[in-house]
């Protein structure tokens, strides 16, 4: 068949390697399953975060509420990834062939969605660690600027993955420079958090730092993966990596912050939080004597 445009232009037009690779039915089903589990988990946890906010001291309730917003936003984006995945392939014989027609699969929606979710996730940190207000605003902005630059340079670069690897790598490096800047800003918040956490809870910000590095670090791996080959396994493994990263950096991260804040609320004298944590028979008796 004669292409109306050069192969390079055609390769760029399909955007992501998902549109270049024929999948076995097992790989296609795995892709659907990974995306379905991801959006299902995000939507379900809206409820968890809204309910859990009620156990916290009022000044901390905004933190799980922000997690609920992130869950809704990411859930919608991942639902869209799922439906696009379903539309992008057609069954030919026993294989799922990308149609490269009007409905092509794209990971670019993810990057668009991060523009919203990442600044929210970062702003949760100084609020949860009770950094006082003018400093909190300053730190939120100082983290969000490199974060958005990291995402947009990565968004531009990822279109190179279908063949233009120098575009993928050059913009990948530029994006990584912003990531390093972001990591430095996050470290500043963690250091402040260690300094003002109650002594019993000081391990939480310390451990969260390593958790942050390990989970946010999965995204550049997913970005670089297409260079290992255009195969069905790479396509599926990449979606799996994105999903593990999504569930870790948004959902589990939100649970960690909420559990930290439950303890902190209790230590700061908020009785419903203390009761929620209390497991001893005496504690239960005291709680019931209070009549609630
Ligand atoms: C990109 C491009 C390649 C280089 C680097 C990247 C980093 C991406 C990160 C994304 C984090 C996203 C989160 C989303 C939650 O909703 C852009 C892939 C370093 C760290 C936490």
Model-derived regions, located:
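Short aromatic-rich membrane-water interface segments that cap or initiate transmembrane helices
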Residues: 25-29, 97-115, 239-244
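Hydrophobic alpha-helical transmembrane segments of multi-pass membrane proteins
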Residues: 41, 63-87, 213-227
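Alpha-helical transmembrane segments in multipass membrane proteins, preferentially the mid-helix core
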Residues: 44-48, 124, 153-157, 177-199, ...
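C-terminal transmembrane-bundle signature of multipass membrane proteins
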Residues: 184-188, 207-292
């Amino acid at each position: 068949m004669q292409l109306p445009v050069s192969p390079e232009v055609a390769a760029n037009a399909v955007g992501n390697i998902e549109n270049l690779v024929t999948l076995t039915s097992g790989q296609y089903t795995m892709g659907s399953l990974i995306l379905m589990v991801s959006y299902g988990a995000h939507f379900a946890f809206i409820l968890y975060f809204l309910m859990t906010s009620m156990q916290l001291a009022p000044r901390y309730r905004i933190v799980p509420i922000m997690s609920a917003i992130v869950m809704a936003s990411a859930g919608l984006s991942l639902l869209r990834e799922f439906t696009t995945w379903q539309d992008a392939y057609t069954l030919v014989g026993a294989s799922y062939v990308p149609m490269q027609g009007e409905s092509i699969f794209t990971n670019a929606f993810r990057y668009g969605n991060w523009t919203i979710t990442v600044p929210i996730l970062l702003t949760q940190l100084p609020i949860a660690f009770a950094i006082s207000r003018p400093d909190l605003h300053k730190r939120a902005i100082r983290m969000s600027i490199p974060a958005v630059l990291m995402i947009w340079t990565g968004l531009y670069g990822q279109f190179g993955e279908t063949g233009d690897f120098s575009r993928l790598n050059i913009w990948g490096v530029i994006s990584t420079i912003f990531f390093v800047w972001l990591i430095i800003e996050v470290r500043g918040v963690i250091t402040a958090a260690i300094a003002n956490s109650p002594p019993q809870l000081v391990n939480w910000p310390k451990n969260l730092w390593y958790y942050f590095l390990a989970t946010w670090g999965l995204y550049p791996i997913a970005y670089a993966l297409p260079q290992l080959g255009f195969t069905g396994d790479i396509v599926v493994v990449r979606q799996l990596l994105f999903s593990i990263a999504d569930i870790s950096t948004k959902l589990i991260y939100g649970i960690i912050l909420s559990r930290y804040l439950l303890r902190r609320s209790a230590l700061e004298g908020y009785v419903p939080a203390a009761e929620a944590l209390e497991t001893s028979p005496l504690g239960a008796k005291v709680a019931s004597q209070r009549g609630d």
